A protein has these predicted regions:
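Active-site neighborhood of HAD-like aspartate-dependent phosphohydrolases
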Residues: 1-50
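Substrate-recognition element of Asp-dependent hydrolases with the DxDx(T/V) motif
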Residues: 58, 62, 67-101
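Surface-exposed amphipathic alpha-helices with a cationic face
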Residues: 71-75, 129, 143, 147
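Substrate-recognition "cap/lid" segment bordering the active-site pocket of phosphatases
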Residues: 84-134, 140, 144
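Short acidic-hydrophobic, aromatic-tinged amphipathic segments that line or gate anion-handling sites
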Residues: 113-117, 168-177, 181
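Short amphipathic alpha-helix with an adjacent loop that forms part of the alpha/beta core around
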Residues: 122-129, 176-184
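Acidic, Mg2+-coordinating phosphoryl-transfer loop and its flanking beta/alpha structural elements
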Residues: 134-173
Length: 184
């Protein structure tokens, strides 16, 4: 078994949405975000998300559910964990993002790659084709990209993504469910 985990960050490892909603309440009262993985909500929402991703707020996200506990356990059991987030390429925001992850989970990630804002993850995932890795994501289009490459794919269920089904995409509620499925 190749012990490789590929994971998105926001909505999977870190609780981006709660922190973003706190930011909205403070700076944009009355604004709402329904699905952080698409911009059908309008140009203004996309602009606010990009702005948020480049503020100091991005360095202080809390963990998503049981991510710290279970990813640490994976690491202790010899798994190599690689993250990919499409939060944008501001060097200072990226540094804060990496520090946030490292502060919550010291030495758990082998690497965190940060790609341009909202860029699909197909190119990043393609380097892992045939590796036996697993892929964890909350955005449907990126989950499908992984599944179509033959990468075992888990979709972290959220209010905005759990009403779809796709061959090769397994829906899960938390990291413990993934751990139990891949270590049995």
């Amino acid at each position: 078994v190749h012990k490789i985990i590929l994971t998105d960050i926001d909505g999977v490892v870190l609780d981006w949405q709660t922190h973003f909603n706190d930011y909205l309440d403070k700076y944009y009262p009355g604004q709402e975000l329904f699905d952080p993985t698409v911009f059908a909500q309008g140009e203004e929402t996309g602009k606010i998300i990009r702005e948020f991703n480049n503020t100091a707020w991005i360095g202080f996200l809390k963990p998503w559910k049981d991510s710290v506990e279970v990813l640490t356990e994976f690491k202790e059991n010899g798994w190599h964990i690689f993250g990919c987030t499409s939060m944008g390429t501001d060097q200072y925001a990226n540094s804060l993002r990496k520090k946030n992850i490292e502060n919550l989970m010291p030495d758990v990630f082998a690497r965190v790659d940060i790609i341009p804002f909202m860029e699909p993850k197909g190119h990043w995932l393609s380097q892992w084709r045939g590796s036996g890795a697993i892929w964890v994501e909350d955005k449907w289009s990126n989950a499908i990209l992984g599944a179509d490459m033959g990468i075992r794919t888990f979709l972290m269920k959220q209010s905005y993504n759990s009403n779809h089904d796709y061959k090769g995409v397994e829906k899960i509620d938390n990291w413990r469910q993934i751990y139990n499925k891949v270590t049995q």
